[in-house]
């Protein structure tokens, strides 16, 4: 994330993390405080939530809500080696990492992660807070629900939908719409665990 922000021309002022890490260095940038300190920087800085999908999007969403309540603005970051069509839309707080592609007519919502070398094809919809992992392929007109996770190298066939909060395992191939919340894996992708 840091290298993507640097390549996009952002000046990074510092990092917020947990209290135990204050003063630590991450790729040349100091951890200057915790999320509770966000309001101190809200007037002069835009924020990017760098935490990805860890078992669910709940922790990431909690941080986004906390920063929003503190009056923070969010940057949309597109790495210099990524391609985003001028006919695509990206929501506030979304990040598109190196070598990722977002093609014409695609709509990527707020606070999404389009990870390294992921491909979001024409007319795809990626809803709020979804994470499209490294090398995933979302074919034309497919849809990814809010807070869903599409694992590394997974493929969504054209026009299929993945439901909100669902997880698609690495390397899985989604050939039909999977609207029931759950964890899916395989080729073709099958439900392996229902979400409660």
Where are these regions (language model features)?
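Phosphate-bearing ligand-interacting subdomains
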Residues: 23-83
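Glycine-rich adenosine-cofactor-binding loop
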Residues: 1-5
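NAD(P)-binding Rossmann-fold cofactor-contacting core
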Residues: 8-26
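Short, acidic/turn-prone active-site loops that include or flank metal/cofactor-
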Residues: 17-21, 36-37, 189
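Cofactor-binding loop segments of dinucleotide-utilizing enzymes, especially the Rossmann-like FAD-
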Residues: 17-18, 52, 79, 187
């Amino acid at each position: 994330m840091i290298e993507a922000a640097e390549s996009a021309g952002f000046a990074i002022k510092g990092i917020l993390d947990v209290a135990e890490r204050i003063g630590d260095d991450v790729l040349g940038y100091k951890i200057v405080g915790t999320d509770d300190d966000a309001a101190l920087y809200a007037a002069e800085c835009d924020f990017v939530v760098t935490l990805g999908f860890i078992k669910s999007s709940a922790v990431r969403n909690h941080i986004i809500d906390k920063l929003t309540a503190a009056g923070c603005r969010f940057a949309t970051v597109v790495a210099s080696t990524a391609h985003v069509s001028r006919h695509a839309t990206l929501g506030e707080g979304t990040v598109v990492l190196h070598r990722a592609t977002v093609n014409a007519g695609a709509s990527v919502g707020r606070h999404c992660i389009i990870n390294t070398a992921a491909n979001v094809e024409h007319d795809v919809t990626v809803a709020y807070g979804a994470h499209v992992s490294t090398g995933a392929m979302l074919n034309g007109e497919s849809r990814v629900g809010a807070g869903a996770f599409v694992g590394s190298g997974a493929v969504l066939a054209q026009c299929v939908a993945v439901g909100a909060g669902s997880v698609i395992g690495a390397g899985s191939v989604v050939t039909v719409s999977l609207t029931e919340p759950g964890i899916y894996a395989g080729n073709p992708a099958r439900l392996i665990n229902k979400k409660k």
